Amino acid sequence: MDVTCPFVLKIHRIVEKESRAGAHIVIIGDPDHPEVVGICGWCMGPYTVIRTEQDALDFVFPIDKNICIVSQTTFNYNKFKDLVEIFLKKSYDSTVLKTICNATEERQTEARAIARKVDAMFVVGGRHSSNTQKLYEICKEECKNTYFIETLVDLESKPFQSFGRVGITAGASTPNKIIEEVQKMSEMSFEQMLDESFKTIRNG
């Protein structure tokens, strides 16, 4: 049974078809990520993996040849658009296919919106999870007090008591139980902070 994500399977079919037709495949993503490694394996011809702006700027290809641009499903959507813009400015004969997972894009958009409104942001999930790392990067761009929370121990070591409003987001594979525990602990700690403040006032 093939349990590969349907979004990833779609990319496999795209790069196989386009590369058989003679296109040079450009994959925007992390070259070491298993998903990207798998996509490369479906390319029937030459391909290039692009992760950074410098990678895109350094890319050189004949103007009269076709390139097909796809992306890792969990890649930062805004960065994807920026990198594609670099290719378009080079006037290549480009076919651009947005292959970022819809749920990933929505989660990133929501996380960015929350991070803009809070004093601190907690990103809950595994440090080795690609989509969680992207969420952290996005939130950090909008809120300097952004923290990676993998376990409750990480939360205990963060100075969140000094922040008025705290936002929480989580990677797609993060268990709901962990998210709920982080939320509960944050709320409890905030209440404890208020209690201590009232004690200080009463004791003058």
Predicted regions span which residues?
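The feature marks the mature, well-folded catalytic cores of soluble enzymes
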Residues: 1-204
